[in-house]
Amino acid sequence: MSVMFDPDTAIYPFPPKPTPLSIDEKAYYREKIKRLLKERNAVMVAHYYTDPEIQQLAEETGGCISDSLEMARFGAKHPASTLLVAGVRFMGETAKILSPEKTILMPTLQAECSLDLGCPVEEFNAFCDAHPDHTVVVYANTSAAVKARADWVVTSSIAVELIDHLDSLGEKIIWAPDKHLGRYVQKQTGADILCWQGACIVHDEFKTQALTRLQEEYLDAAILVHPESPQAIVDMADAVGSTSQLIAAAKTLPHQWLIVATDRGIFYKMQQAVPDKELLEAPTAGEGATCRSCAHCPWMAMNGLQAIAEALEQEGSNHEVHVDERLRERALVPLNRMLDFAATLRG
């Protein structure tokens, strides 16, 4: 597997942690959000990594809790005129690309993703220009501008299948931005992949030594790992997959104890799926190591109840997602290819 671009390790400034709300304040904002959703003909589309109270509210109001692929499907098909996307910025952009006629609101437009930040479009365009004979495949965790340069967009839930398909056609591939997922896919498929060197600040922090210690403490536990994790963590897994695939694995595996190496936001839906099983966070610190994200995306945490209420009430430049029309049309092509390919897999 070739690697051409190795940016300096970036230390992204984390946003301040949201101020905790009192029980009364939470109740107030929950009721306000429910009322505003009805008034605005809006629906919530929330990612698995948002806080449990946000996922619960999405459930209660007829919204969607899912991975980024299903978020894209749900938002495009739902009849609501407004989508409230609880996630990070690229998810709001993707919703606007697929549903330009709808108003796309986010609790904050400052909710970033380290994979998106780690793949600036100018550098990525130069990288692609240097390898014009490669098919460009980018992860969903990228900006609209990077998607517009791509031949395909992909999510982790269909990454192996898509790359296997392209490899069967004899295509050489540029993969961006996640190096760990890229290496995992290359190992699974044997494809010729030229890999960008980005990483998720959450998954990159899982620690092998500390996980080994935890495994020794819970000998009968299964280890579930998202493929954005380092190879050494993936090698320890009993199941590897996207968020939705890990929830499915939790139901299928016979183990009573499950050690989960992904953002702890997934525990809300995973525990619903396996109420009789015990879920443990894979360690991001220990054995002398420390963590910054500590198994929860700091930008996902920005999707609080107060911010959601303000987005629905205020709209405006602080909350509404806009994508340049020419850019949107270009980014729509690889996104539609992804959705069409995913539909063939669903059969």
From Swiss-Prot:
Keyword Metal-binding belongs to the record: yes
Pathway(s) served: Cofactor biosynthesis; NAD(+) biosynthesis; quinolinate from iminoaspartate: step 1/1
Source organism superkingdom: Bacteria
InterPro entries named in the record: NadA, NadA_sf, Quinolinate_synth_A_type1
Location(s), subcellular: Cytoplasm
Family statement: Belongs to the quinolinate synthase family. Type 1 subfamily.
Protein name listed in UniProt: Quinolinate synthase
Organism, scientific name: Shigella dysenteriae serotype 1 (strain Sd197)
